[in-house]
């Protein structure tokens, strides 16, 4: 059975989230496919974005005027620099220079990214049980736990204000929240989603939204 790891069912009608044990602002945003910055703004939460058990968080469904203005500025900047995507769909060096992405494991991609049909918000990479999983870039661990249904033992790493990466279905987590990690540093060990299904579920999220990791990872 392919690993789909769509995460918890996204409830379009959900307007609030009550903080559970183990939640972080980043994991809450990840659960609902939202930008953590918008949730922070909607709830007047400042860095380092501490949330509390049973706290009721408003889920930002629309951007505030300030966020919209910031988005427009970013869009104008991108327009001036061009989209920066090559013919094969990968980012040009100028667009990906800020984050030097690397493959978290060396295995073959067995299930690709798709947001239609049987949704897969990342890629599933074949591996060996207990194989080391490396961080795809420098960053800070913002979630390490098993509180998101469909992901098993999950690690989320923040690489910038816009980009997060996620590593799911692990046998073991080797980092804790707040740890700074270097590109390639081992963060977990590959687990299994069922018999003969030893693989890593890997995602890249930009402003809270899942993106095809193959756009960012180096070709091989």
Regions found by a protein language model. Give the residues of each.
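Extracytoplasmic low-complexity/disordered linkers and repeat tracts associated with LysM-containing
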Residues: 1-156, 160-163, 172-186, 192-197, ...
């Amino acid at each position: 059975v392919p690993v789909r790891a769509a995460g918890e069912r996204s409830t379009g009608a959900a307007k609030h989230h009550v903080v559970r044990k183990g939640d972080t602002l980043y994991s809450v945003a990840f659960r609902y496919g939202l930008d953590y910055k918008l949730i922070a703004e909607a709830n007047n939460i400042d860095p380092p974005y501490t949330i509390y058990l049973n706290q009721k968080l408003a889920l930002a469904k629309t951007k505030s005027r300030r966020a919209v203005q910031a988005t427009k500025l970013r869009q104008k900047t991108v327009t001036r620099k061009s989209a920066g995507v090559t013919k094969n769909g990968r980012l040009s060096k100028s667009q990906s220079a800020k984050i030097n992405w690397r493959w978290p494991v060396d295995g073959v991609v067995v299930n690709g990214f798709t947001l239609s049909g049987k949704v897969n918000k990342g890629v599933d990479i074949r591996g060996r049980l207990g194989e080391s999983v490396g961080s795809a870039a420098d960053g800070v661990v913002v979630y390490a736990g098993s509180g998101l249904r469909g992901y098993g033992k999950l690690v989320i790493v923040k690489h910038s204000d816009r980009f997060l990466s996620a590593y799911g279905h692990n046998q073991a987590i080797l980092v804790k929240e707040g740890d700074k990690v270097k590109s390639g540093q081992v963060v977990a060990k590959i687990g299994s989603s069922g018999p003969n299904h030893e693989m890593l579920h890997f995602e890249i999220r930009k402003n809270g939204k899942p993106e095809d990791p193959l756009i960012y990872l180096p070709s091989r």
